[in-house]
Design a protein with these regions (language model features):
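Sec-dependent bacterial lipoprotein signal peptides
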Residues: 1-30
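Mature, structured domains of secreted/extracytosolic soluble proteins
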Residues: 15-16, 30-1006
Length: 1006
């Protein structure tokens, strides 16, 4: 790591023109306001001020003189009629971290404070009033602290001993109102629409505080460092010292303030303590302030941050300012007082600042919020105490800031930078690349906030304590993956560190590009016609952003565009809503379905939707969208989750080695549905690519159903995580349930016999396989499979011939015969109930019935037990053909791994059939071998094969995709009467295959 050996680099300030913090924008000082205790207990010794005047002996015989510090205090009192000397001479509670005269000589020899002419200040006289205050109040605490107690915080219980090793910051004696900053129009950010409005509104300048909250001093003592596992090497890294820097590293036992060593500690005075510092300390700026003024290294980065800031009128701050002094006449005569804030998830008061002031709660652009407000002086980490004052003391933030030279190189040469430049770079630099840093910043101005915020946020860390070199392996990026993965020595990425009052700026010589720029989600981020999907990805509740940004997984991501040649639909995404299947079912005369029509409202930065009628024959809307907002945010969020779950595939869909003869291969989606994909002759032949959802497959003969692949983006070319396909319409899941397919004897006569068993398999408990409600919720079809439970399944259907043979052999009962015999038995019971000769006739009837059913005449035959046993056997037989896990032919078979780490080729899957073993019940399994073909082995060792055939009506008899839904009406159970209020509560996916023979579960042997 490169180091800077300037004395000011103790603070990491590197000779920055700190005059800006004290004199720029016409800063004017305020009068002080103290409530003095005039009592002076003589037995406690001299006061702080008298001790400074007299000086004192150090531990090693050196004599400390503080004439310069005394001169500074008296100059302040003289300039503003303040009472600092009096305050420090009377009883009170103060702690001062002061520099002696020798330290001030070094300070003025290389002074970071500049005069009005831009020259370094060389004496107290040349310092402005505000600069003097920065030194005095920046080195003072309004309480009494010995060094041993600097790391202590109050006990969270409100009583008991303080918690030691818990504090690294305390609010200094500086007041927000020590100076009044006035910002002139020419100094307002030029790349912000909001600021441009204020330029014209306040031509004479406006009073605008950089934050409006108090600044802290930074403490590092042994107890804190050891408690938080921060090593001496970590400390040296933070303060640009140690090996290779020419400055000695930290020694055990040392304590420092703002990185400056305490040379002599705990000088007791009657009104507090004095600690002698090895160098002058002063009030530190916030990270945002520092970057704004470091035009040599951070011009571009600060220029980007400007776009996320705005002035916020503060009535409270204005009242406080006016109570102390008049606003200078150079400022706007309206005397409005503003505070600068940054649009962020966490700003002042730990509250989100995401609405543009005076805009009727209009969200900031696309809700592009920073992780935290870099100008928030009282920033504290989310993981800290629930009490803000304690949380502030425990931690602060970090910003990784690439230097201007680094950003320029990234913008002009890196894959991510050049991609952004190609898309967003301005015309004037199209043929001639920007040269100066100002030109680079200008060239980057057109990047939308929602895009550039990814870069900023990836380089913001919420905890300094957890972002030191010894903990670099645990620092994460925007995808929650290790940020420094693949970097052998992360420290080499940093040039220098700057300590600020609310965090540390780590200057980097590399750009930590957000994974969002390499992710399959990137096209959605930068394409205006994909804003609907991008908004769903960014939804913090849905949590797709981190999922899609993971670089540990390869994805194929299909994104439907909202671009359309139809002006009524351009910018809208039409999605056939599955709840409309239930709505149509509940209204038998209804011949249309309904679609959600989504659009992105740029003013509100949100997705809106309305419901329109949809023709399932033409696959077009039957009415023109009106832009009405008829669907709640909760329902939209519910649908967006469903859409994304079906458009994300884990793995590469191209070049499958299990595709069928026509080139089709099947792939599971994130939500465990299935899509079908056909590759073109090459990756560039988009017109030859085909992709279908379940609905597209089952309605292949209807108009306008085919999906076109419009674009292909290979994100792996920049070490990304997959391929993105832009498609012209959404993939749709199947509308059919297992019941819909199996019961359709006209289209699927090959399934008739098994359906007859399934439909009549109610067992002795009387609970059928098919149910017309699911957990009291409405369903999309007439019936669902009752055992399905938010998972994915396979239903194996033996051929009609094999079912008939099994029934003919007597292995399982014919349900029609069972019903016939049961009706006969019930009739006998009814007829003989009052017959005096009934017992004899009953015996004869039982002899006849037992002979017909078992082949043996038995007068004691227990028909009811026989009937129930056969019913259970029938139901268990059917349930054994319903398997957990969807297994698709012509799809990669994911069976896990063997003990030796090699891929398994066979998997054992549970079925819906459960048997009793001892006192327990367990699901009976099937052994399955998948891939291009599927083989199933039952518990008796019978091997069956999925028949890859086409039925007599032209339908495939394998890989039949189904989906079974549950819908709520809002949050309640009930029938769907309005698609706009229906919620997809849950669903299950299933695939149906015809197999060449029945599966034996062991209960009946065959």
């Amino acid at each position: 790591m490169k180091k800077n050996n300037s004395p000011a680099s103790l603070f990491g300030l590197k000779g920055l023109a700190l005059a800006v913090l004290a004199t720029a924008f016409g800063i004017t000082s305020c009068k002080s306001d103290f409530d003095l205790d005039k009592r002076t207990p003589e037995w406690l010794g001299t006061s702080i001020f008298e001790t400074m005047v007299n000086g004192f002996e150090g531990n090693e015989g050196q004599h400390y003189q503080f004439n310069t510090f005394v001169e500074l205090i008296r100059a302040l009192d003289k300039e503003s009629n303040s009472t600092y000397e009096s305050v420090l001479s009377r009883t009170g509670s103060k702690t001062l971290f002061i520099a002696d005269d020798d330290a001030f000589k070094r300070f003025f020899a290389d002074c970071p404070f500049k005069t009005a002419s831009g020259e370094p200040a060389r004496s107290i006289e040349e310092l402005s009033h505000a600069q003097k205050l920065m030194i005095l109040n920046g080195s003072m605490l309004n309480n009494v602290y010995q060094v041993a107690m600097l790391s202590s915080t109050p006990n969270p219980s409100g009583s008991g001993a303080p918690v030691t090793g818990n504090c690294m910051r305390r609010v200094s004696a500086a007041s927000v109102y020590d100076s009044i900053p006035i910002i002139m129009p020419e100094d307002m950010p030029s790349n912000s629409e909001i600021w441009r409005g204020y330029k014209s509104k306040f031509p004479n300048g406006m009073v605008c505080f950089s934050d409006g909250t108090r600044r802290s001093m930074i403490f590092f003592v042994d107890k804190f460092l050891t408690s938080h596992k921060i090593t001496d090497d970590d400390y040296d890294f933070l303060f640009n010292q140690g090996e290779g820097t020419g400055r000695p590293g930290r020694k055990p036992g040392e304590a420092s303030i703002n990185g400056v060593k305490i040379e002599y500690k705990d000088k007791k005075c009657f009104n507090g303590f004095i600690h002698v510092m090895s160098d002058v300390i002063y009030l530190l700026p916030s990270m945002a302030e520092y970057l704004e003024q470091d035009t040599e290294n951070a011009y571009i980065y600060s220029h980007i941050l400007d776009r996320f800031s705005c002035p916020v009128y503060s009535e409270g701050v204005q009242k406080e300012v006016l109570s102390r002094m008049e606003i200078p006449s150079t400022a706007e005569t309206t005397q409005k007082v503003f505070v600068r804030q940054y649009f962020s998830l966490r700003s002042q008061g730990n509250a989100e600042f995401g609405k543009i002031p005076n805009s009727n709660d209009k969200p900031f652009k696309d809700n592009a919020l920073l992780k935290f407000d870099p100008g928030w002086n009282e920033y504290y980490a989310e993981s800290g105490s629930t009490e803000a004052n304690i949380a502030l003391q425990q931690n602060m933030g970090v910003m990784f800031v690439p230097t201007d030279a680094t950003i320029k190189k990234w913008w002009l040469e890196s894959p991510a930078g050049t991609s952004l430049r190609k898309r967003y770079g301005i015309a004037k630099y199209r043929n001639s690349a920007p040269v100066t840093y100002k030109e680079v910043a200008e060239d980057m101005d057109s990047i939308p906030e929602k895009v550039i915020v990814k870069l900023i946020n990836n380089n913001m860390q919420g905890s300094l304590v957890n972002t030191v070199p010894s903990k670099f392996p645990n620092v994460l990026n925007d995808a929650q993956d290790p940020l420094f993965e693949g970097i052998s020595d992360p420290e080499t990425c940093f040039d220098s560190i700057v300590m600020c009052c609310n965090g540390a700026v780590y200057y980097t010589n590399t750009v930590f590009t957000p994974t969002a720029y390499r992710s399959v989600s990137y096209p959605a981020l930068v394409n205006e016609y994909l804003q609907i999907i991008n908004a769903a990805i960014e939804d913090v509740t849905l949590q797709f952003s981190a999922y899609l940004n993971s670089m540990q997984v390869t994805y194929s991501f299909f994104i439907p565009t909202a671009q359309s040649s139809d002006p009524n639909l351009n910018g809208k995404l039409v999605w056939l809503d599955p709840s409309s299947f239930a709505h149509r079912k509940n209204n038998p005369g209804q011949d249309y379905l309904e679609a959600m029509v989504f659009r992105y409202n740029t003013e509100k930065s949100k997705v809106e939707a309305e419901v329109c009628k949809y023709d399932p024959q033409t696959n077009k809307l039957l009415e023109v969208p009106t832009a009405a907002t008829t669907v709640s945010d909760d329902v939209i969020q519910n649908r967006m989750r469903d859409i994304l779950d079906y458009h994300i595939i884990i793995g590469n869909v191209e070049g499958s080695d299990v595709a069928d003869a026509d080139g089709y291969a099947y792939f599971p989606t994130k939500g465990r549905g299935t899509i079908r994909f056909k590759m073109g002759a090459s990756a560039e032949d988009l017109d030859q690519m085909e992709v279908d959802g379940g609905y597209q497959i089952e309605n292949a003969n209807t108009a306008n159903i085919k999906i076109s692949v419009l674009e292909r983006h290979d994100q792996t070319s920049d070490h990304g995580n997959g391929v993105t396909y832009i498609i012209d319409k959404p993939l749709l899941t199947s509308s059919k349930s297992v019941y819909d397919v199996l019961s359709d004897s006209a289209e699927y006569p090959e399934f008739y016999e098994f359906f007859n068993l399934m439909n009549n398999a109610s067992g002795s408990d009387g609970k059928p396989i098919f149910v017309n409600k699911s957990n009291g919720n409405d369903i999309a079809s007439k019936f669902n499979v009752g055992s399905f439970n938010t998972y994915h399944y396979t239903v194996y259907v033996p051929t009609n011939e094999s079912i008939k043979a099994l029934i003919d052999s007597g292995k399982i009962a014919d349900p029609d015969k069972l019903t016939e015999f049961n009706d006969y038995w019930e009739g006998i019971k009814s007829d003989l109930a009052d017959d005096p000769e009934g017992d004899l006739i009953w015996i004869d009837s039982m002899l006849d019935l037992s002979k017909r059913l078992t082949g043996v005449a038995d007068s004691s035959f227990n028909y009811k037990a026989y009937y129930n046993r056969k019913r259970d056997e029938l139901k268990n037989f059917v349930k054994y053909h319903i398997q957990d896990n969807s297994v698709i032919a012509n799809a990669k078979f994911e069976a896990g791994y063997k003990d030796d780490g090699s891929p398994a080729t066979i998997a054992n899957y549970e079925t819906a059939y459960m048997k009793t073993v001892g006192k327990n019940q367990q699901f009976v399994k099937l052994k399955v071998e998948g891939g291009k073909d599927i083989k199933i082995t039952d518990v008796k060792g019978n091997t069956r094969n999925v028949l890859k055939q086409t039925g007599s009506k032209g339908h495939s008899l394998y890989n039949i995709l189904c989906r079974e839904y549950e819908f709520k009406v809002g949050t309640s159970a009930g029938d769907i009467t309005d698609v706009s209020t229906a919620m997809i509560e849950t669903s299950s996916y299933a695939v149906i295959h015809l197999i060449d023979g029945p599966l034996c579960n062991g209960e009946v042997d065959f």
